[in-house]
Regions:
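Sec/Tat signal peptide C-region and signal peptidase I cleavage site
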Residues: 18-25
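Exported/periplasmic ABC-transporter solute-binding proteins
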Residues: 25-142
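Bacterial N-terminal signal peptides that target proteins for export
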Residues: 2-11
Length: 142
């Protein structure tokens, strides 16, 4: 009886772990017309906090973000030192005071990648496994 219970427990643990979604590190992506292979940390933070609204020579910045999830949490924590909910609150505050337009937000990485690929001046982040040739992958510099 104990052997069967142990086998069931092991089987449940294996199934639970198999169902856990894995993700790669976030990748910073932009529309190919954004002429910057590297972007420094201060500029990147200014872009995602709405302080930099135009690219040098490439028009207006269009920000695209994931609504939540591990990729969003990791990227936002590393870039602007905020959780996804704090980041959302920051943008709601800016929008209510007339200080900016909230970023376009997406549930799925694939939808965000497609939006960035098709929108001049767009920048966002996706699971690095989903970054493809339709977008430019930027390297944040320290």
């Amino acid at each position: 009886m104990k052997k069967n219970s142990l086998r069931r427990l092991i089987a449940l643990v294996v199934l639970a772990l198999a169902g856990t979604p894995a993700f790669a590190a976030p990748a910073l992506i932009s529309n190919p017309n954004v002429a910057a292979e590297k972007i420094d940390a201060a500029t990147l933070k200014a872009v995602f906090l709405g302080k930099k609204v135009a690219w040098d020579g490439a028009g207006r910045v269009t920000l695209a973000v994931l609504k939540g999830g591990p990729v969003a949490e990791e990227f936002l924590k590393g870039t602007v030192d905020m959780s996804a909910s704090a980041f959302g609150n920051h943008w709601r505050r800016l929008a209510m005071t007339g200080g900016g337009t909230a970023p376009k937000s997406f549930e799925k990485d694939e939808d965000l990648r497609k939006f960035v690929a098709e929108t001049p001046g767009a920048i966002g982040f996706v699971d690095s496994a989903l970054a493809d040739a339709s977008v430019a992958v930027l390297t944040p510099a320290p």
